[in-house]
Regions:
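Non-catalytic all-alpha helical scaffold/repeat segments
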Residues: 1-176
Length: 176
């Protein structure tokens, strides 16, 4: 009974024109996700499509990536919208997601290789995610490929590359 009442309340909140009310749905959706995943995910996707800024809500990118297998077209569209946004935070979220989906699922290949069409924030977000995956053995080579390509073809990378050396992510013998 409580779950169905909560769902009714959330559906009304999503239809509300007040963005703050819509924004406040996310903590509730995160909890309902444990009981009725499909229902919660459909509402999250709907909210992202209603207002792309909702992707900026804490943990939304993680949920968005988890929804990829079930709703790939919706997720790819939402991520691309973030990446092409004028909002720096959304560009960063979109870039992180593009980097991660390219590295783990081979999505966004055309975007990744089209460095000249990207702005500085887009490039830095993708490189940042590639650096994060350097420590994952199965994705290490793909991560190195991205980092090298972006360093070679762009002078706009401002990600602190010294972190790679400080955190022992590269081995001078095996990675030379």
């Amino acid at each position: 009974l409580l779950l169905s009442q909560s769902k009714d309340l959330i559906d009304r909140m999503i239809k509300d024109n007040n963005k703050i009310v819509q924004f406040s749905c996310f903590p509730l959706l995160y909890q309902i996700n444990y009981f009725d995943r499909q229902w919660a995910e459909e509402r999250m996707i709907n909210l992202f499509k209603l207002d792309i800024r909702m992707v900026g809500v804490m943990y939304s990118r993680n949920y968005l990536l988890q929804m990829y297998n079930e709703y790939p077209q919706d997720v790819l569209q939402i991520i691309n919208t973030c990446f092409m946004s004028q909002d720096k935070r959304l560009i960063e979220i979109g870039g992180y997601a593009i980097g991660e989906l390219y590295i783990t699922k081979d999505e966004f290949k055309d975007t990744i290789i089209n460095i000249k069409m990207m702005n500085k924030n887009q490039k830095n977000a993708i490189v940042h995610m590639a650096v994060c995956y350097l420590n994952v053995p199965e994705y290490r080579n793909k991560s190195k490929e991205i980092i090298l390509r972006y360093i070679r073809f762009s002078d706009q990378i401002s990600y602190p590359m010294w972190n790679i050396f400080r955190d022992n992510m590269l081995d001078l013998e095996s990675d030379s």
